Amino acid sequence: MAATAVAAGTGSPAGTESAEGGPGAAAALELWLNKATDPSMAEQDWSAIQKFCEQVNTDPSGPTHAPWLLAHKIQSPQEKEALYALTVLEICMNHCGEKFHSEVAKFRFLNELIKVLSPKYLGAWATEKVKGRVIEILFSWTVWFPEDIKIRDAYQMLKKQGIIKQDPKLPMDKILPPPSPWPKSIFDADEEKSKLLTRLLKSNHPEDLQAANRLIKNLVKEEQEKSEKVSRRVSAVEEVRSHVRVLREMLSMYRRPGHALPDQQALQVVYERCEKLRPTLFRLASDTTDDDDALAEILQANDLLTQGVRLYKQVVEGRVSAGNAVPAAVGAIPAPRAFPNPEPCGLNCPLIDLETPSLLHQDLAALGINDVPTRNQVVIPSCCNDKKQPGAITLMGGGIQSLSADRNLLDLFSPQPSPGLNYVPQKSIPKEVPPGTKASPGWSWEAGPLASSTASQNTPLAHVFVPLESVKPSSLPPIVVYDRNGFRILLHFSQTGAPGHPDVKVLLLTMMSTATQPVWDVMFQVAVPKSMRVKLQPASSSKLPAFSPLMPPAVISQTLLLDNPHKEPIRLRYKLTFNQGGQPFSEVGEVKDFPDLAVLSTA
């Protein structure tokens, strides 16, 4: 039965490849594989493995022919030959390129591995050691290649059928594939070692061949240590993002009146875990000095973690200092008005430069906001205000200006968290403003998810929060908001309104990139007519990696809440700022293609 199964699985591909690559190439592959899996050898011949990998990479038909040769060896009744073949398969998966990888990730080849495990085929004769190695390999591939759906499906099927009882614990010396492409051959990474290895392999002395085997093992071990370091980094960064996200969600409950506060013990556990992750990131950063991209990822995670810890301290301390007062927006720096007894000016009080014009002046005019502040209109920290006149400030040449006149502009003064950067007031909006945009009165501006103002708190949106995972898109087609240079933004409609506020429309922004360059520092701002209210909740991220056809595209999601009490036709202006390939972009536009309100209400 075993021989029949192998013939059925390998006959067609082998014949095809012989036509393409010729009998000589196929014979060379078989020759090196026979040497690499020779069961009479006490130890595996690493030089034969190297030659086999080189033959796969140089022979045009190698990547498609080699998997079937390996499948035949893996199904061998001799335990040692099968185990040697599985080792060769792992190494080829690491170093024989994308085409070999894609062939192995097909059901046609995966079925050959499943036959070794299934009692209906070879499972009754295969040894437990061989079956254990096959399970380890399949499980490791599901971990390292999550984008290969067929591998995951095959593994899950084996678990559902009870053939795999539980996920194996991978041994420390296991050769794992890297998350990013390695050199064509691990033996070419170090030129000196490559030359030494070539010289040793050409020697006829047994001592030199033993030295070559030791050198190959050391090279494989070094690559293995590199992959483990990458795995630790990826795991730590993902844990940071996960814990900070949970911490922010729990802290956001403080600003929702009528909602139960989060469990204090659970909140403390999440916060303490965030604190413990900081030294982990420091160690990873000190060990990652030769990879700029990896170091940037670690530093970005550290900034995100620092912001989360700082937010926890601000919310907790603000709640203690101001009784039961809740900060206007979780994530924003508490406004001076939240503290009735401000401390006197000290050494850390920021100075106000009255000579510098506001960077917002031209931006607000370009976005069509009528309440553009004058040149000298600035917001003074509460510690510098005259205590006898808390509601007014005197400016040079500007007379007495009431703070209440700036309420519609406070959204843009509220700080915005940016991964990898500390917030600097008034500098989060780039100076570049597209020329020719005329001001249009009668629009209300929403600067971002952390906006805070007395005016906004008087609206239903101030205390409305819709979790991203609860948004269910409707059947209406999305609106294309922006589509240039491979960066695309869509606006989706939700099936229902906000919980407890059915008149508040829930919309979902999705941003994705098909550009070959990464996009970062993405910030989306919106404005609606004065008769409406709009609120942007925090985005899921602010960066998109460079597009890869081998990976699923990354997406930034952001929930938008819209209150339209007068049922007027919806109009929405936006300002989009981002950095792509080192070049900053600032775009302004308007979305007019909204469906009729009657259609929206029935969607």
From Swiss-Prot:
A GO term from the CC aspect: early endosome membrane
Domain GAT: 190-317
Alphabetical GO biological process terms: Golgi to plasma membrane protein transport; intracellular protein transport; protein localization to cell surface
Region (Unstructured hinge): 318-473
CDD domains: VHS_GGA2 (cd17010)
Chain intervals with Low complexity compositional bias: 13-22
Keywords: Endosome, Golgi apparatus, Membrane, Protein transport, Transport, Ubl conjugation
Domain of life assignment: Eukaryota
Membrane topology: Peripheral membrane protein
Signal peptide segment: none
InterPro entries from the UniProt entry: Clathrin_a/b/g-adaptin_app_Ig (IPR008152), Clathrin_app_Ig-like_sf (IPR013041), ENTH_VHS (IPR008942), GAE_dom (IPR008153), GAT_dom (IPR004152), GAT_sf (IPR038425), GGA1-3 (IPR027422), GGA_N-GAT (IPR041198)
Domain spans labelled GAE: 474-595
Annotated spans, Disordered: 1-22
Protein family: Belongs to the GGA protein family.
Function: Plays a role in protein sorting and trafficking between the trans-Golgi network (TGN) and endosomes. Mediates the ARF-dependent recruitment of clathrin to the TGN and binds ubiquitinated proteins and membrane cargo molecules with a cytosolic acidic cluster-dileucine (DXXLL) motif. Mediates export of the GPCR receptor ADRA2B to the cell surface. Regulates retrograde transport of phosphorylated form of BACE1 from endosomes to the trans-Golgi network.
Name of this protein: ADP-ribosylation factor-binding protein GGA2
Organism: Mus musculus
Lineage, broadest ranks: Eukaryota, Metazoa, Chordata, Craniata, Vertebrata
